[in-house]
């Protein structure tokens, strides 16, 4: 086999892709690359299907872009980081946050990261930018969206931190519920 063919396959991955209303397919796609100095590339080790993925399939998410790799519930190992990423490094096991956010805009500074004004902000992974139902995922704002997993926590245990647990915690926080509320 020639080197060109081998190298081209090394840059290809499998990705579960939203094709059109009612249709997903497992496709070969190029592996993601660092596009911004704040990005990280994560090799996905475990992911789950969220109800939001099913909403995309059934046409309930008009902002979902056909051709996008779905999925925003995943854990993995950092493969590569951009030059401005300081909180994670290659080899770290991480959870990936459901929300992508800059941390700098008005909404992020107020804690409403779902309304981040960055084009890749809010629920972007698996909806408007390629998500984690793939072998690899490019994570914008890696220092905001990746959290290291302690060695005592399995991938399966950590999987619920990025969306399932975080969504309930965040909803309670922005609702300004206090300990005295019933």
Residue ranges and their predicted role:
Residues 13, 38, 92, 180-182:
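Nucleotide donor/acceptor-binding cores
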Residues 104-182:
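NAD(P)H dinucleotide-binding glycine-rich loop of Rossmann-like/cofactor-binding domains
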Residues 17-24:
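Extracellular beta-rich ligand/substrate-recognition surface
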Residues 32-47, 60-109, 150-153:
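Glycine-rich beta-strand-centered segment in the early N-terminal region that forms part
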Residues 19, 31-32, 65-71, 125-130, ...:
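Short Gly/Pro-enriched turn/cap motifs at secondary-structure boundaries
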Residues 1-14:
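Basic/polar N-terminal segments that are highly enriched at the extreme N-terminus
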Residues 52-58:
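Cytochrome P450 core scaffold surrounding the K-helix E-X-X-R motif
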